[in-house]
Swiss-Prot record:
Name of the protein: Minor outer capsid protein P9
Compositional bias (Acidic residues): 315-324
Function: Minor outer capsid protein.
Provenance organism: Rice dwarf virus (isolate Fujian)
Biased composition (Basic and acidic residues): 285-298
Chief site of localization: virion
Family under the similarity heading: Belongs to the phytoreovirus minor outer capsid protein P9 family.
GO CC annotations on file: host cell cytoplasm; viral outer capsid
Tagged with keyword Phosphoprotein: no
Subcellular localization: Virion; Host cytoplasm
Keyword tRNA-binding recorded: no
Region (Disordered): 246-330
Keywords: Capsid protein, Host cytoplasm, Outer capsid protein, Virion
Amino acid sequence: MGKLQDGIAIKRINDAITTFKNYKLGELKQGGSMAINTLSNVRAHVGLAWPAILRNCLIHTSSHLGFMKFMIDIATTWKVGAFTLLGSVGDEDPFTDVDLIYTKTCLHLGLKDNDFLQFPEEFAYEANSFLEAQSMNAKVDMLTGVHNIEDKYVFRMQSISKFLKAYYTASEDVAYLTGFIKPDDSKDSILNAELLEAQVTSEVLRVRNLITTKIQKYINLYEDSQLPHFRQAALSYIQDWDVDGGVPAALPQPDTTDDERPVTKPGPSTPTVSKGVDEPEDEEMIRKKVETSKDAPSKADPPGNVSPRGVPALLEDDMSEMDMPDGFHDYLTREHENNFDLSQLGLAPSV
């Protein structure tokens, strides 16, 4: 593969950062998602540097929200090969120094090269180990590996679930994560620091809500699935998230939006769930909140980010044709006869 010139290396990381900055929840559901195609292309050209690039995207404030949505998508998709997007391509590292190139890319994009979240050391180590392990373990041989893809799917989902749980635990103290913000004495610097702190806090809380909502939805859809790989993944989620009776016992019930609709089994009561838009607050909105909060009396923190929610019935479009007896293999057979493309299964190209 050889070493990449700085210009090309910066372009690759530029594409990754920009994609995660604009990543929308549910990109994996789209057959021709530009975001997924771009990430697949970057992955195919950066070799063993892929986990280091993902790690930087996880902890940088500009790409953090999008990266976590990407991980949530992989953890809750029916595309059993989507986890291969975490695997590296080839056995060479074309970068001389990934972190240095990442810093140069931030400057090229007009981003601060020191706006990195400060996760607890234990999670930082765990996240790095997770991404390095997936770099190797998420690879699938396109000739022989497809035959046991369901087994690999279960193992990968278990690993991703543990990563999300570790993130959830590490992000309980949002103030700790924003401790990197150290403004100077100028008015603009103080305001910008407050804006960034408000933005990071909002995004971390949003990610925590998305995790609990989407994990719960996956469990409700697949814990009784007749397809063993979906059922096993759902059962492992139940164990990891201490779910009892369809509600995460140790986790708050999050606010919901169009992308975050919780889905539970039909019950006698199906109240309406409020809807919103899955978009982070824009800078102007955050700026107004910060300036307003200066004059407002301080309030005690609420007991938790909890909002009552109803129990909506299962939506028909949430049910997959693959959640039927032998549905998955029938689906593969039918699609193969119709010139089936493995990318539609969520299998990222490995070469």
